[in-house]
């Protein structure tokens, strides 16, 4: 009986953690729609800390962070964030979107050059 109770507690706690992460990410998207990029960055940092065991969420978090950096006219930082996505998650949907954002920034002449966005991969 104790084992069943312990398993139920673990399952419930895991579900609460997932709910908390989803809620933070949802609030980040809502703040982005309102144009509150400082709030978005804060919520994304919290979501990132809660999602360390779910690495598949990192490209989504990074893409939203890059879009906020663009809104704040921090174009080099946005380009570096997009390059991070392309380097570490090349087969993801978010890498495709990041490449499109990088190309748009280059066409708008916000890219300083390829040297400014060079990111070296880090081994986990």
Regions found by a protein language model. Name each.
Residues 16-34, 46, 51:
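Bacterial Sec signal peptide processing site at the extreme N-terminus
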Residues 48-57, 86-100:
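Short solvent-exposed coil/turn linkers within tandem alpha-helical repeat scaffolds
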